[in-house]
């Protein structure tokens, strides 16, 4: 993220879910999923952010 958008940080908004906010089969209940966004919350970056996550092995 820092190489793609200088000054923008990666935000992890949720990892483990114990409150039941995700669908029943969600990997959040196993600690194998995260919800991420950027510090500027610019939704136009989400496609590229997804690609970066896949390229990083997530």
Swiss-Prot record:
GO molecular function, one term: peptidase activity
Binding site for Zn(2+): 28, 35
GO terms under cellular component: extracellular space; plasma membrane
UniProt keyword Calcium present: yes
Binding site for Ca(2+) 1: 13-14
Transmembrane segments: none
GO biological process: animal organ development; cell development; cell fate specification; cell-cell signaling; central nervous system development; neuron differentiation; proteolysis; regulation of gene expression
Predominant cellular place of this UniProt entry's protein: secreted
Subcellular localization: Secreted; Cell membrane
Pfam family, one: HH_signal
Matches recorded under SUPFAM superfamilies: Hedgehog/DD-peptidase
Modifications made to the protein after synthesis: The C-terminal domain displays an autoproteolysis activity and a cholesterol transferase activity. Both activities result in the cleavage of the full-length protein and covalent attachment of a cholesterol moiety to the C-terminal of the newly generated N-terminal fragment (N-product). The N-product is the active species in both local and long-range signaling, whereas the C-product has no signaling activity. Cholesterylation is required for N-product targeting to lipid rafts and multimerization.
This protein's domain notes: The sonic hedgehog protein N-product binds calcium and zinc ions; this stabilizes the protein fold and is essential for protein-protein interactions mediated by this domain.
Family: Belongs to the hedgehog family.
Quaternary structure (record): N-product is active as a multimer.
Protein role: Intercellular signal essential for a variety of patterning events during development. Signal produced by the notochord that induces somite patterning, dorso-ventral patterning of the brain and early patterning of the developing eyes. Displays floor plate-inducing activity. Binds to the patched (PTC) receptor, which functions in association with smoothened (SMO), to activate the transcription of target genes. In the absence of SHH, PTC represses the constitutive signaling activity of SMO.
Name of this protein: Sonic hedgehog protein
The species this protein was found in: Pseudorasbora parva
Taxonomic lineage from the root: Eukaryota, Metazoa, Chordata, Craniata, Vertebrata
